[in-house]
């Protein structure tokens, strides 16, 4: 890769990082392309060389979130509880290395909830169903006591809602320490694990 190509890639990544932070803090509708350009210390014209619109930039962030959401599906597990433990340990490790992941968590949550997001982008976020896959793992593991009794869908919903809440709080309070992974696992853990 030439020096020029490296500089272009660094600029593109800077735009993505600054946009992620602003979209997470202000939402899609209240973030202006001029705000992103200013945060990235570049002109709006230069920013448009990398992303043709605010919508395309936001879509890139949501696509990154969708790709990141596939990571837990790639985990090899010895028991069903390991899937959740390793997912959270992996998420926390990535966030420590790349804080942009916190902002992407917030953006994905906003995108699922907001009616102001362009529909095709919202569909990308709504197409991620970590809860359904997790509910299937919980249902299978309940038979062996790995998970507490109860509706697997509600347990999955509660677990991932707690994770989303943690990520959103860490995004707005960067000095906050990460909670214990065990605390999150306790939401779904069954008697066999005591």
Which residues does each PLM region occupy?
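Short secondary-structure transition hinges
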Residues: 93-136
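Helix-turn-helix
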Residues: 14, 18, 22-56, 60
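Hydrophobic alpha-helical connector segments
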Residues: 60, 73-100, 154-159
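Hydrophobic/aromatic-rich alpha-helical bundle segments in the mid-to-C-terminal region
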Residues: 102-106, 120-124, 128, 142-188
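An amphipathic alpha-helix signature
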Residues: 16, 59, 85, 89, ...
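Short, basic, alpha-helical segments at the C-terminal edge of helix-turn-helix-like DNA-binding modules
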Residues: 63-69
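N-terminal intrinsically disordered/low-complexity leader segments
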Residues: 1-10
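Short coil/turn segments at alpha/beta junctions that flank glycine-rich nucleotide-binding fingerprints
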Residues: 25-29, 98, 144
């Amino acid at each position: 890769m030439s020096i020029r190509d490296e500089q272009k890639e660094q600029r593109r990544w800077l735009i993505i990082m600054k946009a992620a932070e602003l979209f997470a803090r202000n939402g899609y509708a209240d973030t202006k392309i001029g705000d992103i350009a200013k945060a990235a210390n570049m002109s709006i014209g230069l920013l448009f060389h990398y992303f043709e619109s605010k919508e395309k930039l936001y879509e890139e962030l949501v696509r990154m979130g969708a790709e990141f959401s596939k990571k837990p599906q790639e985990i090899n597990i010895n028991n069903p509880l390991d899937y959740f433990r390793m997912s959270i340990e992996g998420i926390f490790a990535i966030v420590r290395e790349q804080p942009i992941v916190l902002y992407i968590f917030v953006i994905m949550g906003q995108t699922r909830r907001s009616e102001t997001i362009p529909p095709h982008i919202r569909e990308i976020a709504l197409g991620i169903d970590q809860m359904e896959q997790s509910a299937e793992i919980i249902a299978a593991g309940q038979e062996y006591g790995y998970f507490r009794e109860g509706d697997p869908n509600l347990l999955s919903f509660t677990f991932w809602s707690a994770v989303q809440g943690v990520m959103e709080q860490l995004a707005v309070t960067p000095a906050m320490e990460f909670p214990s992974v065990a605390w999150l696992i306790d939401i779904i853990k069954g008697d066999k694990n005591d």
